[in-house]
Amino acid sequence: MSRVANNPITIPDSVKVNIDNSIIKVSGSKGELDFNIPNSVSIKQEESLLTIEFGESQNSVALAGTTRALVNNMIIGVSEGYTKTLQLVGVGYRAKASGKLLEMNLGFSHPVKYTLPDDVNVETPSQTEVVLSSHNKQLLGQAAAEIRAFRPPEPYKGKGVKYADEVIKRKEAKKAAAGA
């Protein structure tokens, strides 16, 4: 039995949900998202609640929990949106956003340029902080991970691109061997 899929999803007043065959479309003030519902799962809409119905097989129970989580993320995304904050830690590390292009100096001999997906917006409140926002949680996480991958934080000095809430496990530098 799936504990996640048993919980109904409440639909806010500002969100419109349309279920057509095996496609669910969710639209709100921030945008519109759609999702293909797996064959072993069905979604029923009753007023402002969505319930997930599924079979007895282990596969359909697992898909039901995943489907419920993804649809809930879609509803939150189109009503409130998601944000991720990245910090650039290191001497001379800075970022500048212009439209859909993010240009970063990360200690390489050349600036790193990253073009953001259409649904992801970027702001740089300071030179060492990048704020990404989107209504699509998956796309936002993918873009943030790709930016972080240019220079992941290293454990000795902590330099690199890190998430704002990420804690870097620090290591101690190797000590010179004492006289044998």
Where are these regions (language model features)?
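N-terminal intrinsically disordered, cationic/polar leader segments
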Residues: 2-133, 137-145, 149-180
